[in-house]
Every structure is written in C-alpha cells, then in structure tokens.
C-alpha cells in the first residue's frame, strides 16, 4: 500500500487545502528520506569499510578487489540521479510492484546514495591514525576488533557529519524524484507551483525543505558536540 493512501485521510479535514497538501507532501518526503537513508547506509557502510581494509597496506589487503570495487563505486557516483532513477524503474517494479509513488522512489534513492555513503565512510576511516591500528595489532587484537572497537569509534564525529550530508543530499534527490512521479514536496512544487503557476505553493514547499535541512544539520551538530564533550575534546 502506498504511503499517501495512509496519510491523506489524516489531513483531509483541514480547512485550508494548501495546508493539507503541504502536510501530506512533507510526510511523503520524510518517509522517502528516512527509508532511503537506512537502506543506503546498509548498502554503503560495509562497502566503505571494504574500500579501506582491502586497500594497499590495509588489514585485509586485496589490491585487485579494491581497484574493481573503486571503479564500480565511481561509475555509480557518476550517474545523474534522474537517469539512474529511470534505469532502475524495472528494479523498483520488481521490488515494490510499482515505479510511481514514494515507496517506489526508495529503491533508486537508496542505490543512488549508497556510493556516496561508501566514499564518506572510506574518507572517515582513512582519517584514523595508523599508529592506533598498529598498536592494536601489536596487542593481538583481531581484525574485526580493530574495525569495530578502534577505527569506527575513532572516526565517529566524521561519520555523523557524513551521514548528515547524505540525508541532506537525499532530501534534494527526493525533490528531483518528485518530478517523475515519486510524490513529496518536489512533486508538489512542480505540479502546483510551476505547472499551475501557484507560486505560493512552490515557496511554501521550498521553505519546508529548508527547515528540514536546518533541523537535520542541527541534530547532527548536536550529536557530534555531545560525543566530543563525552570524550573531553
């Protein structure tokens, strides 16, 4: 069942139809971004770890595998999102049974963001002092312990900032997805604000997107601040 069919009855009694449309579209956008963030992290996070541990000098050095994986990631990152979404229509239809709607958009949003997550995780892990890794190895720590107990905790603030950037990017992607039937604030801004010349609706949609971005950035900054305060930095 599409998310819009579940949430529209909740807002249909609003006196102002514009408020009702904005509320539904905002929930659709949050729904798309929330799910695609989870799935892109599930896809991209382990790939980012693999990029680091299999590189030359890594704890699981596999140079050929690392090179091939890097090429694939770079190829996926180079695709414009609109084109990628169209190419993934068959996969969306296979997974959710449709190519239209917020749920269908989660598939290309997740796959489109996963390579960026992988590179963000890779960059964060590469910032970890190699001396810490060598010290852990000298004390007999297993590779999994080094990854999960040393490397990931050490780059926590950078990872949080990277995840925030990913979420904000997904908000922009979701707006683009709205132009080809995904719903959300992007769809509302195009269908009513642009095609029907209702400038006020477009402005309201943009304001809500800006608010969402500001809230997410503030939450991310607060999480990093709390972590650094806990560590005494």
Where are these regions (language model features)?
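Transmembrane alpha-helix signature in integral membrane proteins
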Residues: 22-53
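Membrane-embedded alpha-helices of multi-pass transport/permease systems
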Residues: 42-47, 104-107, 111-133, 163-164, ...
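Cytoplasmic-entry segments and transmembrane alpha-helices of multi-pass inner-membrane transporters
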Residues: 50-87, 109, 114, 120-123
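Short helix-to-coil transition segments within interhelical loops
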Residues: 125-155, 195
């Amino acid at each position: 069942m599409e998310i819009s069919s579940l949430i529209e009855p909740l807002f249909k009694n609003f006196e102002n139809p514009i408020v009702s449309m904005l509320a539904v579209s905002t929930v659709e956008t949050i729904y798309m971004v929330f799910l695609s963030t989870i799935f892109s992290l599930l896809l991209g996070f382990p790939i980012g770890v693999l990029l680091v541990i299999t590189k030359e000098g890594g704890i699981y050095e596999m140079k050929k595998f690392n090179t091939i994986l890097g090429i694939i990631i770079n190829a996926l990152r180079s695709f414009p999102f609109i084109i990628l979404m169209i190419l993934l229509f068959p996969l969306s239809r296979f997974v959710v049974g449709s190519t239209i709607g917020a749920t269908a958009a989660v598939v290309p949003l997740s796959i489109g963001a996963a390579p960026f997550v992988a590179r963000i995780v890779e960059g964060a892990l590469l910032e970890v002092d190699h001396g810490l890794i060598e010290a852990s190895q000298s004390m007999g720590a297993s590779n999994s312990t080094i990854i999960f107990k040393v490397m990931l905790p050490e780059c926590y603030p950078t990872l949080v900032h990277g995840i925030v950037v990913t979420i904000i990017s997904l908000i922009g992607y979701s707006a683009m997805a709205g132009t080809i039937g995904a719903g959300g604030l992007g769809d509302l801004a195009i269908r009513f604000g642009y095609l029907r010349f209702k400038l006020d609706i477009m402005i309201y949609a943009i304001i809500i997107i800006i608010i969402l971005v500001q809230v997410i950035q503030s939450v991310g900054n607060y999480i990093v601040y709390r972590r650094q305060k806990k560590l005494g930095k």
